[in-house]
């Protein structure tokens, strides 16, 4: 695979972050007024500037067929599996930033392909400064491309395996999912087209976006932390359908400087949607 890098520019409008707050304001406290982007809010910005989409409605430049130059590689679903965010410098709202996106690797695992994407958020510096760019934020995301239908049986954790406390409960609606897709300019059909989701990819309904669940987690846990989050590693374990009541939980085994959180199902104690390690 040839090295591939794309560059996107965007103005980080405070109107868009306020729109995200407004989406949740009746169920979650409004974030404190700040001039800076919160960790994870960059997901609302830097949409790819390509017109060509795959049949699932998402951009095709990152799929294995495009990256490996093999048009015979077909897939039924793409899944947002896991990722990492690292904050190096404050990111100021209503300023223009540059996003450098590159492919770290493409791996074939059995009949599936895994694509690891890295994004670096940069701010241009004055001409009289030796280094022309400051690295403000690093992101890694891992997508899986598969031909298998969506699992009807959720991955479950044994009850009592971990001790945790519930910080917040939140019920996600279908309109939350649709509205978030509009805010983040995400055209992926599994987030708005119920017929496609059911009859093509095999889900029971539309599903919540991976970035949305990361932002929801951050918004719920930050008030309980003494310092801003500087690093977050997460793994998605199950799909989140509309009208699911989520419990944002903190593991009681968290160590100094590192906290472990989960997004669980309120009604089904052994159903975990996300696990995340957070460093402050």
UniProtKB/Swiss-Prot annotation:
GO terms for cellular component: mitochondrion. It is found in: Mitochondrion. Its main location: mitochondrion. InterPro entries: HotDog_dom_sf, Htd2, Mitochondrial_HTD2. One of its GO terms (molecular function) is (3R)-hydroxyacyl-[acyl-carrier-protein] dehydratase activity. Keywords: Lyase, Mitochondrion, NAD, Oxidoreductase. SUPFAM superfamilies: Thioesterase/thiol ester dehydrase-isomerase. GO terms for biological process: fatty acid biosynthetic process; fatty acid metabolic process. Its EC number is 4.2.1.-. Present with 799 molecules/cell in log phase SD medium. Belongs to the HTD2 family. Mitochondrial 3-hydroxyacyl-thioester dehydratase involved in fatty acid biosynthesis. Required for respiratory growth and for normal mitochondrial morphology. This is Hydroxyacyl-thioester dehydratase type 2, mitochondrial.
